[in-house]
Amino acid sequence: MRLTEAVVYRLRAIMAEKNITPYYFHVNGGIAKSSISQLFNGKQGKVTLDFLYQFTSTLGISLREFFDDPIFDEVTD
């Protein structure tokens, strides 16, 4: 699994737990709708830590909490 796929998988899992939609990141985190769409539709190339931090801070979790998931053990790239 590619890192970007694992990031999206993890974001979707957290979103399901918190019952939120991708639009939440635009409204509450100021992330551009186009950036959100590209990420969730697999059109985002590489995900930078700065970009990911925008999502985690909007969710109220640390990067450490975000990456503390077995899905990242499956990353091969």
For each predicted feature, which ranges?
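Short alpha-helical DNA-recognition segment
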Residues: N19-Q38
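Short, basic-rich loop-to-helix N-cap that marks the start of a DNA-contacting helix
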Residues: K43-Q54
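Phosphate-coordinating loops and pocket residues in cytosolic domains that bind phosphorylated ligands
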Residues: V27, N41, D68
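Residues within the helices of the helix-turn-helix
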Residues: R12, Y23, Y53, R64
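A short, Lys/Arg-rich alpha-helix, primarily the initiator
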Residues: M1-T21
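Short, charged recognition helix plus adjacent turn
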Residues: Q38, F67-D77
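The alpha-helix within a helix-turn-helix
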Residues: M15, H26, T56
